[in-house]
Regions:
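Terminal low-complexity tails and localization/encapsulation signals of metabolic enzymes
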Residues: 220-228
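Hydrophobic alpha-helical membrane-association signature
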Residues: 5-9, 58, 161, 202
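Short, charged, surface-exposed hinge/linker loops at domain edges
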Residues: 184-193
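Short, hydrophobic secondary-structure boundary micro-motifs
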Residues: 25, 54, 180-182, 195-199, ...
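Terminal peptide-recognition signature
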Residues: 8-9, 27, 39, 72, ...
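Crotonase-fold acyl-CoA enzyme core
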Residues: 64-180, 204-212, 217
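Conserved CoA-thioester-binding segment of acyl-CoA-metabolizing enzymes
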Residues: 1-28, 46, 64
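Glycine- (often His-adjacent) and acidic-residue-rich active-site loop
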Residues: 1, 29-65, 81, 109, ...
Length: 228
């Protein structure tokens, strides 16, 4: 993901919300992955990323827009989902994953902290006991494991993912729009209490982490691997 990606997603969602004929939104990835997290390859050698600004201006507004949208958002996780993409996926209302998909949060491994709502949504979905070691150790979580943990609603064979998503989206579109929007609002109000403060805290701590020597070394190692 790049800054532009988050901005384009938010703009697309706003356009959909403004069209009364649209009753549901589907979010998926282009290509093999759902999302690979923030694109560190955009950084120059030795550059210190302004992660507070990245989150405040680009990614946190997207998460807020998704949760506040009148539209039910179906997240179609079509492949690997890493870093900030996990938070964006979990910000959806109905999450359907391909059987080959997995979820991966490498933040701590590169001297960063979870962001884009990760530290809010994942503990509330799976519980602190499962979320804490998963985030600290950065182990990959398969789609089947995510289903068992309650992170996703349904897992389907890769070949059936598009058809299943379309069928669910069609069912949602048949519902009364006002009732759907009000129900989503009730659920978000019940589960996202303190989301604004949480996103702000993620932003601040990520900014601090992004200025540490460990993070600089992690970025240098990543860029070196890319060149190699």
């Amino acid at each position: 993901y790049r800054d532009q990606t988050a901005d384009e997603l938010r703009d697309a969602l706003k356009r959909a919300e403004a069209d009364p004929a649209i009753r549901v939104a589907v979010l998926t990835g282009a290509g093999r992955a759902f999302g690979s997290g923030y694109d560190l390859s955009t950084l120059a050698p030795g550059e210190v990323p302004e992660l507070e600004r990245v989150l405040e201006v680009h990614f946190n507004p997207l998460v807020r827009e998704m949760r506040a949208s009148r539209l039910p958002i179906v997240t179609q996780v079509n492949g690997p989902c890493a870093g900030a993409a996990v938070g964006i996926a979990l910000a959806g209302d109905v999450i359907i994953a391909a059987r080959s998909a997995y979820f991966y949060e490498p933040f701590v491994g590169i001297a960063l902290v979870p962001d884009a709502g990760n530290a809010l949504f994942r503990p509330r979905l799976v519980g602190r006991g499962r979320a804490t070691p998963a985030m600290l150790l950065g182990d990959r979580l398969s789609a089947e494991e995510a289903l068992a943990w309650g992170m996703v609603w349904r897992v389907v064979d890769d070949a059936m993912l598009a058809d299943e998503t379309d069928a669910v989206a069609a069912r949602l579109a048949e519902r009364t729009p006002g009732a759907v929007a009000a129900t989503k609002r009730l659920i978000v109000a019940a589960t996202d209490n303190g989301m604004g403060e949480q996103l702000d805290l993620e932003r601040d701590l990520q900014g601090e982490a992004g200025r540490t020597p460990e993070m600089k070394a992690a970025i240098a190692a990543f860029l070196a691997r890319r060149k190699g």
